[in-house]
Amino acid sequence: MVGRIYHVVLTVSDLDRSIAFYRDILGLEFQGEIFMEGEETDKMFRKENCKARVAYLNGSKALEAPPVELIQFVDSKIHKEQSDLFTTSISEVCLYTDDIDSVYKKLIENHVECLSEPQYFDFGADGFGESRAFYFRDPDGIILEMMQPL
C-alpha cells in the first residue's frame, strides 16, 4: 500500500543554478547530491546511456515532509515547455512558510517572476481553514506556490 509522498522531483536545465535558487533564495537546506548512471538508470528512465545529476533539498527535518529532488539529465536534450496551471500535469508544488510577506519581498528583490501578490483565502466553512498564498516561477519556469496557513 502507498504510505506517503516520499519526494517531489523537478527536472531542471541547470542543476547548480537551481540549487542556488532553492537554497539561497527559498531557504531550503541542501541535503546532498548523487550521480545516476548504468543499466538500472537506463531501465528506470527508458533511455540508453542515461546520466543524471540529482540534488536533494528540504525545508523541514520532519519525516513526513518530502524533500524536493532536482534532476538534471547530462548530455540529454531537455524538452522545455512553459508550466501552465491549466494543463493536465503537475501544475505546481506548494511550499509552506510562516512569513509569506518576507518571502514575497525576497523573491521580488531577487527578480523572481511572481504571478500575483499574496492573496487571502478563507476555506474555513469547507474545513480547510484560512491561508495566504501566491504563485511564482523557478529559474526554469516551473510554477511553485508559497502558502502560509493562518
Report each predicted region and the residues it spans.
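Conserved long hydrophobic alpha-helices within structured protein cores
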Residues: A20-M36, P66-Q72, V103-P118
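General N-terminal targeting signals
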Residues: Y22, G27, F45-K47, F73-V74, ...
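Vicinal oxygen chelate
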Residues: I5-S13, E33, A55-D75, H79-L150
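A short, acidic/glycine-rich surface segment
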Residues: G38-K43, S76-E81, F121-G127
